[in-house]
Amino acid sequence: MSVVVRRSAAARRLWSWESFCQWITSTENRLYIGWFGVLMIPTLLAATFCFVIAFIAAPPVDVDGIREPVIGSLLGGNNLISAAVVPTSAAIALHFYPIWEAASLEEWLYNGGPYQLIVFHFLIGVWCYLGRQWELSYRLGMRPWIAVAFSAPAAAATAVLLVYPIGQGSFSEGLPLGIAGTFYFMLAFQAEHNILMHPASWLGVAGVFGGALLASLHGSLVISSLIRETSEEESQNAGYRFGQQEVTYNFLAGHYAFLGRLGIPSLGWRNSRSVHFWMAALPTLGIWAAAIGIGLMAFNLNGFNFNQSILDSQGRFIPTYADLLNRANLGIQAMHAPNAHHFPLLLAAKAD
């Protein structure tokens, strides 16, 4: 009798594990979880909770490592625009700095420990979300291009939050987690690396703007070439039935006939798949290029810098936009430099 009981208990445990696996990998759930979701959900929740608490009530952080803490929380006097989670202190550099590595919680907060906690958990969650997209596509029999497209913003987040601090030797150089902090990072990055003159930045701008142009063009042509299924008194939108197999707009009328007559007829699209491919490919390639550029400049492979101005045959200075850009970079570098505490000459003489 005892043998039968042990077998039934083992079978019950096996059934519960199998049911858990089926529930995790089921495509019938309202929200697909997947095995990547098992890791994604707790990491993103941890990053979100820590970010909200730090954004509201974090104490000042000695980000430059010179005993001049910077406060970024709302309770410290900031508003929603200026508030940010301040990066980990330069005194920590690239060391892994969990709570148990600090002597006290106050020390961990003073050195910007929450920034590392948020960044590491967030990046793990982002890449698990990418894996979850691939996993759901695989189980539904779809091709994996959704995950490939999402790899572009995932790579961009990894570049500014992890690769750039590693290349610069300190997490204090990472992106501050806030609105004004993001623009501060952009200005400091331009001053240090001249990203506006880097080919990867050019490719990124061309890809993102090209994708935006193509998306607005395609969307406007679709809305303008809807196939009417209703009377003149009713809206065309009322003729759509959810899940219908019939097409809802005339692709050739919009892209080939209308757009072809506005521009070059031979360049008018005849295939909707090619349009949607370029709508996905252009911004994906552009953001990939920008992420690669951040990775290159993290190790000081900077943009073009024309340090020597153009001179005419008589040696006279000819001003160009490159000179204006260099002057702007020098000005931003001066504002970005930490306070070195230069004492007045009188005090320095008395100290001697």
UniProtKB/Swiss-Prot annotation:
Signal peptide: none
Binding site for pheophytin a: 129
Amino-acid positions noted as binding chlorophyll a in the UniProt annotation, renumbered to this chain: 121
TM region positions: 32-49, 121-136, 145-159, 200-221, 278-292
Ion transport is among the record's keywords: no
Post-translational events: Tyr-164 forms a radical intermediate that is referred to as redox-active TyrZ, YZ or Y-Z. C-terminally processed by CtpA; processing is essential to allow assembly of the oxygen-evolving complex and thus photosynthetic growth.
A GO cellular component annotation in the UniProt record: photosystem II
Binding site residues for a quinone: 218
Single annotated GO MF: chlorophyll binding
Keyword Calcium: yes
Keywords assigned: Calcium, Chlorophyll, Chromophore, Electron transport, Herbicide resistance, Iron, Magnesium, Manganese, Membrane, Metal-binding, Oxidoreductase, Photosynthesis, Photosystem II, Thylakoid, Transmembrane, Transmembrane helix, Transport
Self-association state and partner proteins as the record states: PSII is composed of 1 copy each of membrane proteins PsbA, PsbB, PsbC, PsbD, PsbE, PsbF, PsbH, PsbI, PsbJ, PsbK, PsbL, PsbM, PsbT, PsbX, PsbY, PsbZ, Psb30/Ycf12, peripheral proteins PsbO, CyanoQ (PsbQ), PsbU, PsbV and a large number of cofactors. It forms dimeric complexes.
Biological role: Photosystem II (PSII) is a light-driven water:plastoquinone oxidoreductase that uses light energy to abstract electrons from H(2)O, generating O(2) and a proton gradient subsequently used for ATP formation. It consists of a core antenna complex that captures photons, and an electron transfer chain that converts photonic excitation into a charge separation. The D1/D2 (PsbA/PsbD) reaction center heterodimer binds P680, the primary electron donor of PSII as well as several subsequent electron acceptors.
Protein name: Photosystem II protein D1 2
Gene this protein is translated from: psbA2
